[in-house]
Amino acid sequence: ARFEAAIENAMALSNRINTWEGRWPLDTYARDMDAAALSQYARERLADARSMSQEIYQGLLTERAAIRDLYAALQEKFDACMTLAAPGAAPQGLAWTGDPAFTVATSLIGMPAVTLPVLKDQGLPLGLQVIGFVDQDATLFAHADALQSIFNP
């Protein structure tokens, strides 16, 4: 329950970290190339990044490290964890590819993951995400293979 509570704001935390880390490429482009060519979103993100300090960024990394530690502790009880890859089927069209909340949380903690196309929602594929632990990629793939065999005998 502690880990689940800790990742409730994974999207916001990941976005803030990415905003800081994306500052320099955007800054370089805006300064040396064509700032007007940046999208409104990129300009807003750059302004947000410029308003952040190294101390804020360090605090974000500390928060991420604490979440990673909570996840690592799960290895004492579990060989892998599972979640959906998304909250539902991908929407139709190309305007939006769907909610990445579940995959963002996995990326935030930096763990290896495999998505198995074994479920359906509204007749469309819905992935089952199997998440492993640091340096346990072979174990993760073994569990993913076993699950794939169960869903598709």
Where in this protein do the model-derived segments appear?
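Gly/Ser-rich, acidic/histidine-flanked active-site/gating loops
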Residues: 1-13, 119
